[in-house]
Amino acid sequence: MHFTKLDDSPMFRKQLQSMEESAEILRERSLKFYKGCRKYTEGLGEAYDGDIAFASALETFGGGHNDPISVAFGGPVMTKFTIALREIGTYKEVLRSQVEHILNDRLLQFANMDLHEVKEARKRFDKASLTYDQAREKFLSLRKGTKSDVAAALEQELHTSRSMFEQARFNLVTALSNVEAKKRFEFLEAVSGTMDAHLRYFKQGYELLHQMEPYINQVLTYAQQSRERSNYEQAALNEKMQEYKRQVDRESRWGSNGSNGSPNGDGIQAIGRSSHKMIDAVMQSAARGKVQTIRQGYLSKRSSNLRGDWKRRFFVLDSRGMLYYYRKQCSKPSGSGSQLSGQRNSSELGSGLLSRWLSSNNHGHGGVHDEKSVARHTVNLLTSTIKVDADQSDLRFCFRIISPTKNYTLQAESALDQMDWIEKITGVIASLLSSQVPEQRLPGSPMGSGHHRSASESSSYESSEYDHPTTEEFVCERSFLGYNERPSRSFQPQRSIRKGEKPIDALRKVCGNDKCADCGAPEPDWASLNLGVLVCIECSGVHRNLGVHISKVRSLTLDVKVWEPSVISLFQALGNTFANTVWEELLHSRSAIHFDPGLTVSDKSRVMVTGKPSYADMISIKEKYIQAKYAEKLFVRRSRDSDFPQSAAQQMWDAVSGNDKKAVYRLIVNGDADVNYVYDQTSSSSLTLSRVILVPERPKREDVLLRLRNELLDRTGSSSNISPEGSGGSSLLHCACEKADLGMVELLLQYGANVNASDSSGQTPLHCCLLRGKVTIARLLLTRGADPEAMNREGKTALDIAAESNFTDPEVLALLSDTNGYNHRQC
């Protein structure tokens, strides 16, 4: 108790005064504290505005998914961080509101109401005390002879004033007691409540960022990998530039030390057999509308006017036999073609960057071209010949192209450059003459019909890499084997990515790929290449911890280069729904658990009590489930020998022959089938033939084998298919290269198929592709480590086989020639 006695006494008055002084000091302190708290809340408000401004700036900087510049530096990834930043800003705004309500408002109320009430009570007490003193003096100053009614009135006034005085005194005591009581809890409660608000603020922020930690780590890892790749690419670029400088120096020294003149000879010069073959192969590609650049670079051209001045022009020799040049330097286009105007020489017999750029401009601009980007048609080489040196000119490195309509005098920049131009033009003329292409079928200009190619043959990224690989391969196979009937079901074109469609959009259309294969989270944006499933970012972190021997995790949005046509074809053939029927078969079929021979008693009990997690479950639950699902194969039903009359190897062979990716996938997962299984001559080659094993009488079996083989040869018109008599030592990859498609080859490679395996004839899968015109599969094998220098039993390499089998794909030929020493590119 603050007041032991309530009697009005000097000690009581002194105690009141002391408490009032303490209350006034507390009021001043409270107001100062309030000013500091208000400044703090204003700072929180400014910090919230700063957070929102930072998030908005990051969102603007990151751009959108359709912005190519944004995608190049990871803008879509950064945009995801803006959501977290805005959420953190919201937490900060909530903190500011709580501090203002819990601390600022209570401080202001305590100072302006509770402490102010003490002052008001003191004023009322002083006024009542004065009134009471006056009434008491009047009453005590009465004489004895005062009338009774006057005395009664003064006595009543004294009683009233005393009551008012006592009431005012107790009101002051109440106000002071209230202040003293609130001192014990008001400030502690306000400050501790403020700290609790801070605790919740930081806890919410931690939980939010902790949930994003796997994604942040993935982005950091990807950024580090990108840094390493960039350093490697920069070093490779520097090496290329140094090599270019060394090549220029060698050419300069060769030109200065060599002949001052030019080689003599008229007409068509003899060129190397290998170079002639390669030029001829590229020339043949023009028949399918694929225009390739054989040679391009700068030449000086003498004008036909009286002055005969020389002007530097950029000439292009393409696979249609056309030689044309640019009147002016190319205007800077969008895309990779922007650097062509500064390029002296380019790769030959390659992909033809300039023709690609011209083609893309034709399709992209509807044939309307600026003068700066239009190539001027020069000459049809079919009716032309070459003469070395200029007519009546003592200049070095000159040569002439003589045609029925016009003569062109050209000057190269060195003797080596001159010889190379003459060799390439001579080779083109020889190829044109040998093929006897009618004059009227040749395009009239570089911008003519030769460039009006279909979308599937465009050189853009979307069309060149993703447009109908199965269809293209089948057309090539028909041209090699002479098929006349309709293609079988196994070679029907699969679903492919439409032009401009992103891999993530195409793969999410596959059954079950709209949800994570492991937890069911919507819109998964990560994938396991070898498992063929789409997973969310949280499950992808668990997959990464399993190791690449179990799951090869890649991002659908970050790892753009991974999503080749073969990988996309494989994913479209599988899907999360099918993959889970293999990996979770026992999980959804409890009755099969008791009959699975591969499960122990403890494993069976684990399967019975284990359930599939949801995306809201803790990461530890998902880790245990994914570990059991893929690493331990706890929910996979093991294949038994009694399930099928055939061996696992024979089933694999039949599935690959039938292009049944799902069956191959199931056999690999269920029975750990050997993808490097080698076909034995004593085994059968197809599901139809394998059924003959069940026939009891051997003579009848042999008759059926012979009849089926003859029917097979009658249908195809060729004996190139793998058969029991001619497939000794063939691997599953050999079989896939001949009978399956790109996705099947990708599936076998993902599970460790030997890309350089050879059969009894020494033929590798690459050799088989070249023999049968499998263009896309040949490209895939070369990019996955196929050895172009491997020889068969006859000592022939892949390039030799391609030359003999009239294989005409320029990209594959360029890859083969680079390895075998036929690289004719001028750096």
Curated annotation (Swiss-Prot):
Annotated Low complexity bias: 255-267
Zinc finger (C4-type): 516-539
Induction or repression: Up-regulated by auxin.
Disordered, as annotated region: 246-269, 439-467
Tissue: Broadly expressed. Detected in developing veins of the leaf and root. Detected in roots, hypocotyls, cotyledons, leaves, siliques and shoot apical meristems.
Highest taxon in the source lineage: Eukaryota
Repeat positions for ANK: 728-757, 761-790, 794-825
Domain PH: 292-430
Function, as annotated: GTPase-activating protein (GAP) for ADP ribosylation factor (ARF). Involved in the spatial control of provascular differentiation. Required for the formation of the normal pattern of continuous secondary veins. Involved in auxin signaling but not in polar auxin transport or in auxin responses. Required for PIN1 internalization in roots.
PANTHER family for this protein: ADP-RIBOSYLATION FACTOR GTPASE-ACTIVATING PROTEIN EFFECTOR PROTEIN 1, CENTAURIN/ARF
Domain remarks in the Swiss-Prot or TrEMBL record: The PH domain is responsive of the binding to phosphoinositol. The BAR domain is required and sufficient for homodimerization.
The protein, known as: ADP-ribosylation factor GTPase-activating protein AGD3
Native species: Arabidopsis thaliana
Classification of source organism: Eukaryota, Viridiplantae, Streptophyta, Embryophyta, Tracheophyta
Gene it is expressed from: AGD3
